Amino acid sequence: MNTHPSPHASAAPRPTAGSRAARHLHGFPYATVQLDRNGAPVDPAELRQAMSELSTLDPSDVLVLVHGWNATRASAEARYGRYLGHARTLIDGRLAQDLRGRRFAVIGLVWPSIPESLQSPTDASADDVRAAAQEAFPHDAELLRAVRAGQVPDREHVERLIDHVTESEIFTQEPDLPGREPGRASLRGEALDLGTLWRDIVVWASYYEMRERAGRIGESGGRGLVRDIQKAAPSARVHLLGHSFGARLVASVARGPNGDPPLTLASLHLLQGAFSHFGFGAATGPAPEGYFRPVLTNRVVTGPILVTHTGNDLALSILYTLASTFAGHTRSVRGVNPFGAIGVTGALNAGAQRFVLDAAAPLTFGNGQIYNLQSDAVIPNHGDVEQLDVVRAVLRGISVT
């Protein structure tokens, strides 16, 4: 049993005469709640105000939006505004009948998704590199000895690490990655000096660091936030939507730590999720069940669980595979890449129903079911998920709850 007090306890006061009116985005009552790396509110007054506004509003539905990797508060709120712009268009038009009578409120959760040690990767100090290497490669004793001594690992060792991942079929192509991540030629050291090559590997290491942080925040502060919402608006349906590592965060909210009292959620929406495609999977032969399997078996989500996935997501295809391979995470099932991300192939071994998501898809969902939405036609890459038809799928999922 988890006996640690929530940092969110008693954070949902009843409204007072001095409470200010809620902020609106595209006509939706909206508030941002920012959490720190341990899941505690950065500004407890911000959380209290958001819950006070919910109590006043008495919404029928509360939608919690969660951003992914490498986002600031400003960029997260801009993304949330794009989601809600599409939602307003749909609720006022194509989906007006489906959502008639619903009173929405929206919480935008912001979490520290940029590693402190790598906020400026080109200026990372030796201490930063050591911390990131320890986080990403905990079982590589030879590598850790080098970085603890303040050295760049020798070229032979770096090449062995690279050989381990570039033999994967993922590297039969040479796609361009967003930002400054190198392609296969750069990984081989053909165009980069060894120090730059090592720094790029440390950038990948930060991917693993954020994976762990998202799960930790979801199981602590994110889960506490949902409980606060349910206290402030007890009749409201609560819907969670997460992108990238935000999908891992909201899945962790739904699962919770072992022994924690269960939550009930109305729907769960995972957009290009950065966790294993076996995360919801049943045990198969020697492979154990996925970490998030209890979300299904315990019927935490009364409505639909929607999972977008696409082969267009080269960032997940490559970065997730690299990080998982380096960290030694695997759940082998014969004939399937053990390191695949749910945002590339969907939820596997989970009894998911499959839809092709495009402008013409009718999108008829049922309660208590997980759906893989093949999104090649509407999601062009890892980051561009705030598309009209993605939001339409989310709202159609909400409409059946």
Task: Please identify what each model-predicted range represents.
Residues 61, 198-199, 241:
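N-terminal non-globular segments
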Residues 2-40, 115, 124-127, 151-156, ...:
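Lipolytic serine-hydrolase domain surface
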Residues 49-56, 294-295:
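Short amphipathic alpha-helices and their capping/turn segments at secondary-structure boundaries
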Residues 241-246, 250:
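Gly/Ala-rich beta-loop-alpha elbow adjacent to hydrolase catalytic centers
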Residues 126-150:
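Acidic, His- and aromatic-enriched active-site or binding-groove loops in soluble protein domains
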Residues 76-80, 251, 319:
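Conserved strand-to-helix beginnings and helix N-cap segments that scaffold or border functional pockets
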Residues 47-48, 77-90, 286-291, 388-392:
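Well-ordered, non-membrane alpha-helical segments in soluble/globular domains
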Residues 55-123, 144-191, 223:
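Short, surface-exposed "cap/lid" segments of acyl-processing enzymes
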